[in-house]
Design a protein with these regions (language model features):
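N-terminal secretory signal peptides that target proteins for export/translocation
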Residues: 1-14
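Bacterial N-terminal signal peptides
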Residues: 21-32
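Beta-strand-dominated extracellular/periplasmic modules and repeats
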Residues: 38-149
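Compositionally biased low-complexity segments at domain edges in trafficked proteins
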Residues: 148-172
């Protein structure tokens, strides 16, 4: 009886030590992630598509009423892949807010994200590939190496590569 009690007591102490070590490690990770001077903390949100501002032109003239569709593919679950829509104003101007998600445990897992970004433009029954890009970071504004995301999309332009992205839009 006495050996069984001692064995349980030793087992309980081992479990407590392991639990304390795990709690300590998680606390250190959270504090490290929240510390200033780091680009992204453990609890920061994941930026799947940075804020976008742009203008749609046709032969250099602003296009009013063009529909823009912004898509992100970052998960095998289609319900987790967001889509946003907007329409250009009289000056051909459009904007999309950033698409962000909660980090959850993803910040603790060392991995290279693969995020497929797409912007399509629909105008007068024609669909144009405005922007295709493979984003490899959860940080904001990494699409254009830290610059704000500003585009000029010329509908008469043939889609082509510009840096790491493809489409009719040029970064300005």
């Amino acid at each position: 009886m006495r050996n069984t009690w001692k064995s349980r007591q030793l087992a309980n102490r081992s479990v407590l030590r392991v639990s304390a070590a795990i709690l300590f490690a998680l606390t250190v990770l959270v504090l490290w992630g929240l510390s200033e001077g780091r680009a992204m903390g453990v609890l920061d949100r994941l930026v799947l598509f940075s804020e976008v501002h742009g203008t749609v032109l046709k032969a250099g003239a602003p296009v009013e009423g063009a529909e823009l569709i912004q898509k992100v593919v970052w998960s095998d679950d289609a319900d987790k892949n967001p889509t946003q829509h907007t329409v250009t104003d009289k000056d051909g101007v459009f904007a999309f807010p950033a698409i962000e998600r909660n980090a959850g445990l993803l910040r603790l897992i060392p991995a290279q994200p693969t995020i497929q970004q797409t912007i399509l433009i629909r105008y007068q029954g024609v669909e144009f590939v405005a922007w295709l890009h493979g984003k490899g970071s959860y940080n904001a504004n990494t699409e254009l190496d830290g610059r704000p995301f500003r585009l000029v999309c010329e509908l008469t332009r043939q889609p082509d590569y510009e840096g790491k992205h493809y489409g009719i839009c040029r970064a300005v």
